[in-house]
Protein backbone atom coordinates (compact mmCIF):
# COMPACT_ATOMS: atom_id res chain seq x y z
CA UNK A 1 0.00 0.00 0.00
CA UNK A 2 2.78 2.45 0.90
CA UNK A 3 4.52 1.72 -2.40
CA UNK A 4 1.33 2.42 -4.33
CA UNK A 5 0.94 5.75 -2.57
CA UNK A 6 4.53 6.69 -3.38
CA UNK A 7 3.93 5.78 -7.04
CA UNK A 8 0.77 7.88 -7.09
CA UNK A 9 2.63 10.80 -5.53
CA UNK A 10 5.36 10.54 -8.19
CA UNK A 11 2.74 10.39 -10.93
CA UNK A 12 1.17 13.60 -9.61
CA UNK A 13 4.51 15.37 -9.55
CA UNK A 14 5.19 14.45 -13.19
CA UNK A 15 2.02 16.13 -14.47
CA UNK A 16 2.80 19.25 -16.51
CA UNK A 17 1.01 22.53 -15.83
CA UNK A 18 1.37 25.27 -18.43
CA UNK A 19 1.99 28.77 -17.07
CA UNK A 20 -1.27 29.99 -18.62
CA UNK A 21 -3.17 27.33 -16.68
CA UNK A 22 -1.38 28.33 -13.47
CA UNK A 23 -2.35 31.95 -14.17
CA UNK A 24 -5.96 30.88 -14.70
CA UNK A 25 -5.95 28.97 -11.41
CA UNK A 26 -4.50 32.02 -9.63
CA UNK A 27 -7.09 34.30 -11.26
CA UNK A 28 -9.83 32.13 -9.75
CA UNK A 29 -8.10 32.26 -6.35
CA UNK A 30 -7.73 36.04 -6.58
CA UNK A 31 -11.38 36.43 -7.55
CA UNK A 32 -12.36 34.73 -4.27
CA UNK A 33 -10.52 37.52 -2.46
CA UNK A 34 -12.38 40.27 -4.34
CA UNK A 35 -15.92 38.84 -4.35
CA UNK A 36 -18.44 41.01 -2.47
CA UNK A 37 -20.05 38.06 -0.69
CA UNK A 38 -16.79 36.46 0.43
CA UNK A 39 -15.20 37.83 3.60
CA UNK A 40 -12.02 35.78 3.37
CA UNK A 41 -10.82 34.31 0.10
CA UNK A 42 -8.49 31.43 -0.63
CA UNK A 43 -5.07 31.67 1.04
CA UNK A 44 -1.71 31.10 -0.68
CA UNK A 45 -1.54 27.68 0.94
CA UNK A 46 -5.02 26.96 -0.41
CA UNK A 47 -3.85 27.94 -3.89
CA UNK A 48 -0.97 25.45 -3.63
CA UNK A 49 -3.37 22.73 -2.51
CA UNK A 50 -5.62 23.58 -5.47
CA UNK A 51 -2.69 23.18 -7.87
CA UNK A 52 -1.71 19.85 -6.32
CA UNK A 53 -5.30 18.64 -6.52
CA UNK A 54 -5.43 19.53 -10.23
CA UNK A 55 -2.19 17.66 -10.89
CA UNK A 56 -3.29 14.57 -8.96
CA UNK A 57 -6.76 14.54 -10.52
CA UNK A 58 -5.10 14.67 -13.93
CA UNK A 59 -2.67 11.87 -13.09
CA UNK A 60 -5.38 9.63 -11.65
CA UNK A 61 -7.40 10.09 -14.82
CA UNK A 62 -4.47 9.18 -17.06
CA UNK A 63 -3.57 12.68 -18.21
CA UNK A 64 -0.14 14.18 -18.74
CA UNK A 65 -1.04 17.86 -18.37
CA UNK A 66 -3.61 19.93 -16.49
CA UNK A 67 -6.31 21.60 -18.58
CA UNK A 68 -8.37 24.69 -17.74
CA UNK A 69 -11.42 22.40 -17.70
CA UNK A 70 -9.88 20.41 -14.85
CA UNK A 71 -9.09 23.60 -12.92
CA UNK A 72 -12.67 24.84 -13.41
CA UNK A 73 -14.23 21.48 -12.51
CA UNK A 74 -12.26 21.10 -9.27
CA UNK A 75 -12.72 24.67 -8.03
CA UNK A 76 -15.93 24.20 -5.98
CA UNK A 77 -14.71 20.94 -4.47
CA UNK A 78 -11.24 22.16 -3.54
CA UNK A 79 -11.94 25.80 -2.70
CA UNK A 80 -15.45 25.73 -1.27
CA UNK A 81 -14.30 24.98 2.27
CA UNK A 82 -11.37 27.41 2.01
CA UNK A 83 -13.44 30.60 1.93
CA UNK A 84 -15.51 32.39 4.53
CA UNK A 85 -18.71 34.08 3.43
CA UNK A 86 -19.66 37.63 4.45
CA UNK A 87 -23.09 36.59 5.67
CA UNK A 88 -22.50 33.01 6.69
CA UNK A 89 -25.88 32.33 8.29
CA UNK A 90 -28.41 34.13 6.12
CA UNK A 91 -26.92 33.33 2.73
CA UNK A 92 -28.96 30.86 0.72
CA UNK A 93 -25.89 29.98 -1.32
CA UNK A 94 -23.14 27.70 -0.13
CA UNK A 95 -19.49 28.67 -0.38
CA UNK A 96 -18.99 26.19 -3.22
CA UNK A 97 -21.80 27.92 -5.15
CA UNK A 98 -19.90 31.21 -5.03
CA UNK A 99 -16.74 29.50 -6.21
CA UNK A 100 -18.67 27.91 -9.09
CA UNK A 101 -20.07 31.34 -9.96
CA UNK A 102 -16.55 32.79 -10.02
CA UNK A 103 -15.38 30.15 -12.51
CA UNK A 104 -18.03 31.35 -14.97
CA UNK A 105 -16.62 34.89 -14.93
CA UNK A 106 -12.89 34.20 -14.99
CA UNK A 107 -11.67 33.77 -18.55
CA UNK A 108 -9.99 30.45 -19.24
CA UNK A 109 -6.99 30.21 -21.55
CA UNK A 110 -7.48 28.51 -24.91
CA UNK A 111 -3.94 27.65 -26.04
CA UNK A 112 -2.41 24.20 -26.45
CA UNK A 113 -1.44 23.07 -22.94
CA UNK A 114 0.58 19.97 -23.72
CA UNK A 115 4.28 20.10 -23.04
Question: Can you name each region flagged by the protein language model?
Answer:
Residues 34-115:
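C-terminal engagement/docking regions of AAA+ P-loop ATPases
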Amino acid sequence: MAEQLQEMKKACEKVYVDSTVVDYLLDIVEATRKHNNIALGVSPRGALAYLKAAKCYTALNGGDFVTPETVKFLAPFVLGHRIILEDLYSSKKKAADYVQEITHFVTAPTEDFAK
